[in-house]
A protein has these predicted regions:
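Rossmann-like dinucleotide-binding domain that binds NAD(P)(H)
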Residues: 266-438, 452
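N-terminal glycine-/serine-/threonine-rich beta1-alpha1-beta2 phosphate-ribose binding loop
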Residues: 2-174, 193-211, 262-306
Length: 607
């Protein structure tokens, strides 16, 4: 997102951000950051609880993790044993079960993201872990048996998207709390059914059910600080946000097109088995390995053997299907292992990637509302398609969107950073969209394959400053568009502003010290807060991404897919959003999904 910036410009932006955050807390929550530093509550050791206002729980919530693939294992890595006790996992794949215990040994960075239950819970080995963690798969009743386990109070769902809604509904029907991965559901009607069930349901103790969705930016401290700086007025009047998620995936090198266990046929009739080939390579290297390489290769071989064992699973027994697209035939194995590539099991780039960043956009714009409600877009133009990939999928590999959001109304005391004496403008408060339909915030979004330049992130532009959020870990702040000047915060008439004269000696501010250690992307905090809400069932306690918020994100993403479909069928890539789509109690949907039909589907047993 910031590839055009030099290292010096990046460092200036980081220090400007830390200076501004320190000033914000000195003015608004004096000694908050200094208290965090003094008590050692930094990084994963309590920073989230301090920022987001939740405490410890006396009795960790007993949970099951249903779906322990890539994302499920990231969520296992976010399970703090002081808040949740993982009593069961559920997955049909030996590969997923193995990583749930041992973590992902494919690379050092993968093992950090997916450390496994043995590491997370402090077990000595898999045998000890299995004494405390029951494994559900096709041999012992799978998902249905897991949901009926009397020792389970709540479930984390990290299954392929098409299974989010039915498993969540079956869990809530059994009085279980739910945290499901994003997107909330496969279509908008499913989201509304889930939201209604959560509102009407109770847990086994008669307390409200908590249905949370894993848009983890709601629990990212960097995003929370960004919101505070926006509210404080340092960016002035927001008018444009640019966001992207660009990846270098190419044919033959696509992270969403995973190898098929057991291999697959090539055009020459031969079978290519990438997993077996990699396994043989590691076994050969082990024969001559010495020192630390022996242990590393043994761990990798165990993981690849589990991956190879996935060939014993028949996906057709679990709802996956063989199907055709034109003359191209696809197998149920492809639909299971590459579910993101197909519309029946996934919902494409906007669901998997775009929903995260449009959620961030909504967080930024909603922060300026006085009523606390989520901002909804007015319209979207979308184009895209399958521009570089072969016909090995029915989901596109490029999408470009332009969203119009209503501009917020600013308080009369809010300093927008400009005044025209000739026009006497602004004369009082800068109006919002409801007072002046010209007041809009335009958001451009692209998610592409084939070139990863810029990576992923968001750039928020206002009349006084620019805020860059890069890959969820770095935040850069600049006065206007000046990327070279060191700035601090100066109090002016009407508010606060970035100013070069207030930059001080640029020593490491308290905010930087408080953010030492690995940057949390919010997974740990979202699970901790969900558990805290379960154990503290007061009305004011609810997850930050509760059903109305998560459904709003789904409407935005799935609505963009409707606009994209319009562009591909000669109707023009446009969609005007309707407020009733965002109302859980209204049956209207943008994607043609039907409430009654989804209710019947969602309460059927799943395999």
């Amino acid at each position: 997102m910031v590839d055009k910036l030099s290292n010096d410009e990046r460092e200036v932006g980081k220090q400007n951000y830390y200076n501004a955050v320190t000033s914000y807390y000195d003015v608004n929550r004096r000694d908050f950051l200094r208290g965090i530093v003094a008590t050692g509550a930094v990084s994963g050791a309590g920073l989230g609880a301090a920022y987001f206002g939740y405490g410890q729980v006396k009795d960790p919530v007993r949970i099951a993790v249903i779906g322990t693939g890539d994302e499920g294992n990231v969520l296992i890595g976010g399970c703090n044993p002081n808040y949740v006790d993982v009593k069961a996992i559920c997955d049909i794949r030996p590969f997923s079960q193995h990583r749930a215990f041992h973590g992902d040994c494919s690379s050092p960075s993968a093992l950090i993201r997916r450390p496994g239950l043995i590491s997370v819970a402090g077990y000595s080995n898999e045998a000890e872990a299995r004494k405390n963690v029951k494994v559900y798969d096709s041999s012992n009743g799978g998902i249905m048996a897991c949901l009926d386990d009397p020792d389970i109070e709540a479930v984390i769902i990290a299954l392929p998207l098409w299974l989010h809604a039915p498993v969540a509904a079956l869990a809530m029907e059994r009085n279980l709390h739910v945290l499901t991965e994003k997107l909330m559901a496969h279509n908008v009607a499913q989201c509304k059914v889930m939201g209604r069930m959560a509102a009407a349901g109770q847990d086994k103790n008669g307390n409200p059910l908590h249905l949370a969705t894993g848009h983890q930016r709601h629990y990212n401290v960097k995003y929370e600080n960004a919101v505070n700086l926006i509210r404080w007025g340092l960016l002035g009047q927001l008018h444009h946000i640019r966001a992207q998620w660009h990846r270098g995936n190419l044919p033959g090198r696509d992270s969403w097109s995973m190898p098929i266990p057991g291999g697959e046929k090539m055009p020459n009739g031969k079978t290519f088995d990438r997993i077996a080939k990699d396994l043989a390579h590691r076994r050969a290297k082990l024969k001559t390995a010495t020192g630390a390489d022996v242990k590393r290769l043994q761990a990798e071989i165990a993981q690849w053997e589990a991956w190879d064992a996935d060939k014993t699973i028949d996906p057709r027994e679990h709802g996956y299907e063989d199907f055709a697209r034109g003359d191209q035939m696809f197998t149920a194995e492809e639909e299971l292992h590459r579910w993101r590539l197909f519309q029946r099991t996934g919902a494409g780039l906007m669901a998997e990637l775009g929903s995260h960043q449009l959620d961030a956009v909504s967080i930024f714009l909603s922060s300026l509302r006085s009523d606390g409600k989520k901002v909804h877009p007015l319209s979207v133009h979308a184009v895209g398609g399958r521009h570089i990939m072969p016909l090995d999928r029915d989901a596109g590999d490029h999408i470009y969107c332009t969203f119009e959001f209503p501009g917020p109304e600013y308080a009369e005391t809010f300093d927008v950073g400009y005044y025209d004496p000739v026009e006497n403008y602004p004369n009082g408060a800068v109006p919002g969209y409801e007072q002046d339909p010209n007041k809009k915030v335009v958001v451009t979004y692209s998610t592409i394959n084939g070139n990863g330049f810029g990576g992923w992130g968001e750039v928020v532009m206002g009349t006084k400053g620019t805020l860059v959020l890069d890959k969820e870990t770095d935040v850069l702040l600049y006065r206007n568009s000046d990327t070279s000047s060191k700035v601090g915060v100066k109090k002016e008439e009407g508010g606060y502003a970035l100013d070069t004269s207030a930059s001080g000696d640029f020593a490491a501010p308290v905010a930087q010290t408080a953010a030492t250690g690995p940057v949390s992307r919010g997974y740990r905090e979202e699970i901790e807060h969900w558990a805290y809400c379960i154990r503290n069932p007061d009305k004011e306690n609810k997850p930050r991404c509760y059903p109305e918020v998560a459904m709003g994100d789904a409407v935005i993403a799935l609505g963009a897919n409707v606009a994209l479909k319009n562009s591909q069928t000669g109707k023009g890539g446009y969609l005007q959003y309707k407020e009733e789509w965002f109302d859980i109690d209204n049956d209207a949907t943008p994607d043609g999904s039907d409430i009654k039909r989804e209710q019947e589907y969602m309460l059927k047993d799943v395999t």
